[in-house]
Amino acid sequence: MFEINPIRNKISDLTERTQVLRGYLDFDAKVERLEEVNAELEQPDVWNEPEKAQALGKERVALEGVVNTIHTLDQGLEDVEGLLELAIEAEDEATFHEAVAELEELEQQLAKLEFRRMFSGQHDAADCYVDLQAGSGGTEAQDWTEMLLRMYLRWAESKGFKTELMEVSDGDVAGIKSATIKVSGEYAFGWLRTETGIHRLVRKSPFDSNNRRHTSFSAAFVYPEIDDDIDIDINPADLRIDVYRASGAGGQHVNKTESAVRITHIPSGIVVQCQNDRSQHKNKDQCMKQLKAKLYEMELQKKNADKQAMEDNKSDIGWGSQIRSYVLDDSRIKDLRTGVENRNTQAVLDGDLDRFIEASLKAGL
């Protein structure tokens, strides 16, 4: 005979956890809002304002993610209870194992929804930008920065996020000096915000004929794309706008026209660049979006001493502000804030970052 009590206890536990989430995620309000959003999207003139329609579509996906999962959990737990009773009555082991398997699947869905509680920041649901900047160390640091770029692109792909390479500056010999990518998807900023900081690489350098160990640094800075409704006052007189020929990936169009744009905000010293479109006008618009987002993030940091300290540290791409150490010779990657380690270095460099990210979010970093 199979053990019934542990399964009943688990059903009870999952039911209770689902009820807690209903309250925490304000389920009833989300159901109501989903009905409103659906009604708005059904209006024949909704696409007269494309940006508003896109925002509503994005909101609907986020709301459905919560509402549909809660409904699935409610119905699923009821179904499992029915299967369990059927298994007991018929003394049917196959039905019992079916109930156990369904319960495990429901627990995984619930755990994913519970993890969303980590995304409680004001802009966690937003798309975001990731700036990468090579530290001192010449070619070795520039190669490391390109490895980080690949790592984040692979990670985003594994999460189903959309990525755009906004700007990349090639290294002198190999690698890149800097890059900016835009990551779009549900809770993109929430997932990536704890990646801001210095990433340290230790390895035997392929660029050293004596095969000596080298230490290199690269900085990552993650900031959210902000809503157009948020008013950021930018004085055109404070801007220096340069246009130049794009370099790097871009096919036959590269280096033929001055479509790439660089904007310097003189009072703050912030520099943003974009070269991913053939149109100079579109690149300029994208630069202004990035500048607006960075200025907004700077304002938030001024109100928060810890975040301000983090931004101050960013300027020193060296030992003091590291978040993660990648020691390839020892096959060890360690997060210096949470203590999480992974010895499968290639998997991490191929984008397997969830263990590190989840630990830092759970630690409230």
Swiss-Prot record:
Q: Which GO terms describe its cellular component?
A: cytoplasm
Localization annotation: Cytoplasm
Matches recorded under InterPro entries:
PCRF, Pep_chain_release_fac_I, Pep_chain_release_fac_I_sf, PrfB
**Residues with PTM N5-methylglutamine:** Q252
Tell me the PROSITE patterns matching this sequence: RF_PROK_I
UniProt main location, coarse: cytoplasm
UniProt GO molecular function: translation release factor activity, codon specific
PTM remark? Methylated by PrmC. Methylation increases the termination efficiency of RF2.
Specify the superkingdom.
Bacteria
Q: Which UniProt keywords apply?
A: Cytoplasm, Methylation, Protein biosynthesis
HAMAP family noted in UniProt: Rel_fac_2
User: What is the role of the protein in this entry?
Assistant: Peptide chain release factor 2 directs the termination of translation in response to the peptide chain termination codons UGA and UAA.
Q: Which family does it belong to?
A: Belongs to the prokaryotic/mitochondrial release factor family.
Protein's UniProt name: Peptide chain release factor 2
Protein's organism: Pasteurella multocida (strain Pm70)
Lineage runs:
Bacteria, Pseudomonadati, Pseudomonadota, Gammaproteobacteria, Pasteurellales
**Gene behind this protein:** prfB
